[in-house]
């Protein structure tokens, strides 16, 4: 029996190590999310190892910068391991709360990490994937990048600090992205201030090689920026599609309630904007009404909160959301059974002020 347990432990530890590759290349620390078959989604062990690695490298005088990237070309990170969360919640375990708490602690720590932290956002960057990049000093997108906070589609709300980073997008772009969960590409990510640099994907290996060759005397944010520029990188967005709808987004998503936003979209008469309004309304109609409200409110509140206050608000809301929200049903309908027919708990007209205060007292 003891031998069997030992072998099982070895297999488990090997899997942990395989899921996350940690390397030192000269003065560069390199973290690779290594679950390409699962779009590099995060589990609790990976979160713990990333956090521990960063803490060690913070104290390591031979490490001058850190890069985090995903294995493969399809995804940087598709967020948290949804099926594991569903299993924990369904069975009355507490693993999901451990996951959320430690994930949020890691995300907040990244904002305060004292050395250059470089996130290569190549491929899909979804949900929790956004959490481990938005605090980076260099958020690098490529032509393959697809960014989204899709939580409202699965009966949840944008977390991992979204109340902070979405509320700081220009105008009300963050509210639009958080409520609808639409996917944006590289140019829109730059425009929305959710990325800092564009670099062609075929230059990424050269960028990593260049970073690995830097010496202690030449390492710094200025040198990293120069290297990106030399490889064809740029900070300015070129023809972002969001800019074409910016005035419309700001006028509609600055409204204080989901009901008012939906009504404004429904009443759109301008022929140039009517299709966009119809498409946006159609997206919202498929998502959890409570999630739409939660997304709009947390991003609204986040405008007036510090980073620490945003994370504190979100973790309190998570604990309540597990009890009253639509997360289990959303995961069932979209990911497990894939019938795409979630039965949400509430209609938007049922979510009166008094009902919301009873359901989500921490944000209403």
Where are the model-predicted features located?
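Short hydrophobic targeting helices and cationic amphipathic motifs
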Residues: 4-7, 13
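Conserved CoA-thioester-binding segment of acyl-CoA-metabolizing enzymes
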Residues: 14-69, 94, 108-109, 362
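Hydrophobic/aromatic residues within transmembrane alpha-helices
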Residues: 68, 81, 132-133, 188-189, ...
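Glycine- (often His-adjacent) and acidic-residue-rich active-site loop
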Residues: 70-105, 155, 348
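Glycine-rich beta-to-alpha active-site loop
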Residues: 110-154, 176-177, 181-182, 186, ...
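Contiguous mid-protein beta-loop-alpha structural module that forms a pocket-lining wall or clamp
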Residues: 161-164, 168-219
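Amphipathic alpha-helical blocks and their helix-capping loop/short-beta junctions
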Residues: 200-283
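Long, low-complexity C-terminal extensions of enzymes
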Residues: 265-272, 276, 284-364
């Amino acid at each position: 029996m003891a031998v069997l347990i030992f072998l099982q432990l070895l297999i488990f530890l090997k899997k942990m190590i395989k899921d996350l590759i940690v390397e030192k290349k000269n003065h560069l620390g390199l973290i690779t999310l290594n679950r390409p078959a699962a779009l590099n989604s995060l589990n609790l062990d990976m979160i713990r190892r990333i956090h521990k690695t960063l803490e060690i490298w913070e104290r390591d005088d031979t490490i001058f910068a850190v890069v985090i990237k995903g294995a493969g070309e399809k995804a940087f990170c598709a967020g948290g391991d949804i099926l594991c969360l569903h299993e924990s919640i369904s069975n009355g375990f507490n693993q999901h709360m451990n996951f959320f708490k430690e994930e949020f602690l890691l995300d907040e720590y990244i904002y305060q990490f004292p050395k250059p932290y470089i996130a290569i956002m190549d491929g899909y960057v979804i949900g929790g994937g956004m959490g481990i990049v938005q605090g980076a000093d260099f958020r690098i997108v490529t032509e393959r990048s697809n960014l989204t906070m899709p939580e409202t589609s699965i009966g949840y709300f944008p977390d991992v600090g979204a109340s902070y980073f979405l509320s700081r997008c220009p105008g009300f772009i963050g509210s639009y992205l958080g409520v609808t969960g639409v996917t944006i590409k590289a140019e829109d990510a730059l425009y929305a201030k959710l990325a800092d640099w564009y670099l062609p994907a075929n230059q990424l290996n050269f960028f990593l090689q260049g970073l690995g060759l830097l010496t202690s005397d030449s390492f710094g944010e200025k040198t990293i920026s120069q290297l990106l520029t030399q490889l064809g990188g740029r900070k300015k967005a070129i023809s972002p599609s969001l800019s074409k709808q910016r005035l419309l987004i700001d006028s509609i998503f600055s409204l204080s309630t989901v009901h008012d936003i939906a009504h404004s979209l429904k009443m759109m008469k301008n022929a140039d904007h009517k299709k966009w309004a119809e498409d946006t309304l159609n997206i919202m109609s498929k998502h959890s009404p409570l999630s739409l409200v939660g997304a709009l409110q947390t991003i609204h509140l986040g405008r007036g909160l510090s980073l620490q206050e945003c994370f504190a608000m979100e973790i309190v809301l998570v604990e309540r959301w597990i009890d009253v929200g639509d997360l289990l049903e959303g995961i069932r309908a979209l990911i497990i059974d894939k019938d795409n027919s979630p039965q949400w708990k509430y209609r938007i007209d049922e979510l009166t002020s008094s009902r919301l205060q009873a359901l989500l007292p921490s944000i209403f």
